C-alpha cells in the first residue's frame, strides 16, 4: 500500500498551481463606471455609462440596485429598487450586463415574496430552480394555440355568460369597493382541486388588505398552489413598476413546462399611475392625462404574454385577470379604454348593483367575453343560451313595472322568471359551484322548476345542490368533467334531481315553525336608571 507523504502532496499542489497560472492571462480589465448626478424621489440621473441598455440592472455604491428606465445621449434615468437614502450625488454606478431577474420554480408556491423574489413571509430563503428576466417576449403566433379549454371560476354568472378560457385575458373593471378583488380571489379559490397554479400580485396596496387576501386563500383555497407577489404602497416606485412583470415571469415558468397558470394583477390602474410618476420624474414628455406616450405599449406587452401554447410547445396556458379601477363608472377614461382594447373581454361591476346587495355586482349589458365562449363546456352553453336575454328583458320590465301594474300574463311570467334568475346568480363569496352544479341549476331554471317556488328558497337550493347531486345525480359529474357534454338522459336526470331538491326545500319551509314575533318596545328590557 502506497503512503502519501507531505512532500508528495505539496508537489501535487504545486503542479496544479502551475497549470492554473499557465492558463491565466494577466492584464487590466476595463469596466465602465458611472456617477450619480442627481437623486430624488426614487430616481437617479446617472452619467458615464454609454453602453448600458434599456432595463439593464445597475449596481449602485453600497450594494444597492436599480434599472435603466430611460436612455438619453449623456444621462440615464435609473429607477431605484432599494432605499434611496444611502445613494447620493457622486455615488459610483456600474452596469451588470443583465436585465432585472426574478427567481422561478415550484419552490415559490405557497410563499409571499416581493417583486425581486425576496421572501416576505418570514419562512427563510426561497428555493428557486432558476432566475429569469422579468421582461420576456410574448409567444409568437406560431407558438400559440386556440383558447378552447374553460377556466372555471365557480361563479355561476361568469361561467354561464362570460366564460373564461385558459390562455385568455379578461379584464375586471369597476369603481372602488365594488368587489373586483373578490371575484378574482373567488376564481383563485375555485382552482383548489384543479391543476392551475395561481399567482396573485398586489401593486401599491396596504399590507392589511393583502393579508386579508392571503388569509382568505389559506382558509378556503389551496395556498400551496399559489404565489403571492407583494409591492406595498410603502415600497419604492421601482418595485411597484416591476411587480406585474415579475408575476408574469413566475407564471411563465409553469406555462412553458406544459402546466396551467392563472395571474391576477391587482391592479393596473395603480401601475399606470406609478409609470406616469416615473416618466414625469425622468422628464419624459407627457401625453393624455399626463401619461407618457408608451403607456399603451407597456400594458400591451405585459398582457400579450398570457397565451395558450401549441402542443409542440407543451400545451401549457397562462390566463390573466387584470383589475382596473374606474372613477364614477367612467369606462371611457384613458387607462380603462386602453385595457379594454388590449384584453379579450371585460367584466364590468356596477356601483348601483353593489349597493342593492347583489353579489357579484356584474353589469350584464356592458360585460363580455370575446374568446371564452368558444371554450365554454357545450353542456353549460346549451342551458345558458337564453339566460342573458331573459335577464336583460326582466331588468327592463322591472323598471317599467314601477310605474304601474303588469296585466299581461306573458309579461308577468317573464318577471317571475327574472326574479328567480337574479336570486340564483346572487352568490355569496367562497361558495364556488362545480360545472355539474351550474348545468343542473340552469337546466332546472330553463325547465321552469323554480317558477312556482318562493324566491327566498333559491339560496338554500343553490347551497344544497352539490351534496344532493352527489347522491342523486349518477355519474353526470364525472362525464361532464371528462367530455364537457351530457346526453339528454343525463340532463334529464340532473333536472329531476334539482326538482326533488326544490320540493324538499319547499316542504321543509312549509313545515318550519314561524319566527317568533318581534318584541314591542314595552317588552324590551330597559337599561338601569342612573
UniProtKB/Swiss-Prot annotation:
One of its GO terms (cellular component) is plasma membrane. Keywords: ATP synthesis, ATP-binding, Cell inner membrane, Cell membrane, CF(1), Hydrogen ion transport, Ion transport, Membrane, Nucleotide-binding, Translocase, Transport. PROSITE patterns: ATPASE_ALPHA_BETA (PS00152). GO terms for molecular function: ADP binding; ATP binding; proton-transporting ATP synthase activity, rotational mechanism. Residues 507-522 have a biased composition (Low complexity). The record marks 367 as: Required for activity. HAMAP family: ATP_synth_alpha_bact. Belongs to the ATPase alpha/beta chains family. This is ATP synthase subunit alpha 3. The lineage of its organism: Bacteria, Pseudomonadati, Pseudomonadota, Betaproteobacteria, Burkholderiales.
Amino acid at each position: 500500500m502506497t503512503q502519501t507523504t507531505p512532500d508528495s502532496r505539496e508537489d501535487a499542489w504545486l503542479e496544479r498551481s502551475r497549470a492554473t497560472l499557465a492558463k491565466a492571462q494577466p492584464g487590466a480589465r476595463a469596466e465602465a463606471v458611472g456617477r450619480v448626478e442627481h437623486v430624488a424621489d426614487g430616481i437617479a440621473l446617472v452619467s458615464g455609462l454609454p453602453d448600458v441598455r434599456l432595463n439593464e440592472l445597475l449596481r449602485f455604491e453600497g450594494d444597492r440596485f436599480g434599472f435603466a428606465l430611460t436612455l438619453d445621449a449623456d444621462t440615464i434615468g435609473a429607477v431605484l429598487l432599494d432605499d434611496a437614502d444611502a445613494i447620493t450625488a457622486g455615488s459610483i454606478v456600474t452596469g451588470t450586463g443583465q436585465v432585472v431577474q426574478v427567481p422561478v420554480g415550484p419552490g415559490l408556491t405557497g410563499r409571499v415574496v416581493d417583486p425581486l423574489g425576496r421572501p416576505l413571509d418570514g419562512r427563510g430563503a426561497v428555493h428557486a430552480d432558476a432566475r429569469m428576466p422579468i421582461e420576456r417576449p410574448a409567444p409568437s403566433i406560431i407558438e400559440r394555440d386556440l383558447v378552447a379549454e374553460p377556466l372555471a371560476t365557480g361563479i355561476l354568472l361568469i361561467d354561464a355568460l362570460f366564460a373564461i378560457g385558459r390562455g385568455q385575458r379578461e379584464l375586471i373593471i369597476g369603481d372602488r369597493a365594488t368587489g373586483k378583488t373578490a371575484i378574482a380571489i373567488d376564481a383563485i379559490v375555485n382552482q383548489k382541486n384543479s391543476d392551475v397554479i395561481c399567482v396573485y400580485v398586489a401593486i401599491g396596496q396596504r399590507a392589511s388588505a393583502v393579508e386579508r387576501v392571503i388569509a382568505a386563500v389559506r382558509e378556503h383555497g389551496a395556498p400551496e398552489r399559489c404565489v403571492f407577489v407583494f409591492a406595498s404602497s410603502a415600497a419604492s416606485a421601482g418595485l411597484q413598476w416591476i411587480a406585474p412583470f415579475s408575476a408574469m415571469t413566475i407564471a411563465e415558468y409553469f406555462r412553458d413546462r406544459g402546466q396551467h397558470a392563472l395571474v391576477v394583477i391587482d391592479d393596473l390602474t395603480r401601475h399606470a399611475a406609478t409609470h406616469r410618476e416615473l416618466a414625469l420624474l425622468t422628464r419624459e414628455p407627457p401625453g393624455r392625462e399626463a401619461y407618457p406616450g408608451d403607456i399603451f405599449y407597456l400594458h400591451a406587452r405585459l398582457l400579450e404574454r398570457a397565451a395558450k401554447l401549441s402542443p409542440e410547445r407543451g400545451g401549457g396556458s397562462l390566463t390573466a385577470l387584470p383589475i382596473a379601477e374606474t372613477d364614477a363608472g367612467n369606462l371611457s377614461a384613458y387607462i380603462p379604454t386602453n385595457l379594454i382594447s388590449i384584453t379579450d373581454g371585460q367584466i364590468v361591476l356596477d356601483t348601483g348593483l353593489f349597493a342593492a346587495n347583489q353579489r357579484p355586482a356584474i353589469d350584464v349589458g356592458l360585460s363580455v367575453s370575446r374568446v371564452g365562449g368558444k371554450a365554454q363546456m357545450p353542456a353549460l352553453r346549451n342551458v345558458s343560451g337564453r339566460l342573458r336575454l331573459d335577464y336583460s328583458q326582466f331588468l327592463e320590465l322591472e323598471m317599467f313595472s314601477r310605474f304601474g301594474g303588469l296585466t299581461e300574463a306573458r309579461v308577468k311570467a317573464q318577471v317571475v322568471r327574472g326574479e328567480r334568475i337574479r336570486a340564483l346568480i346572487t352568490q355569496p363569496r367562497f361558495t364556488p359551484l362545480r360545472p355539474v352544479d351550474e348545468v343542473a341549476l340552469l337546466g332546472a331554471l330553463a325547465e321552469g322548476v323554480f317558477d312556482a317556488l318562493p324566491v327566498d328558497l333559491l339560496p338554500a337550493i343553490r347551497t344544497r345542490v352539490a351534496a344532493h347531486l352527489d347522491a342523486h345525480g349518477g355519474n353526470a359529474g364525472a362525464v361532464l368533467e371528462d367530455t364537457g357534454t351530457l346526453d339528454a338522459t343525463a340532463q334529464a336526470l340532473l333536472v329531476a334531481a334539482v326538482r326533488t331538491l326544490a320540493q324538499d326545500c319547499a316542504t321543509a319551509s312549509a313545515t318550519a315553525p314561524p319566527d317568533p314575533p318581534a318584541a314591542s318596545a314595552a317588552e324590551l328590557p330597559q337599561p338601569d336608571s342612573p
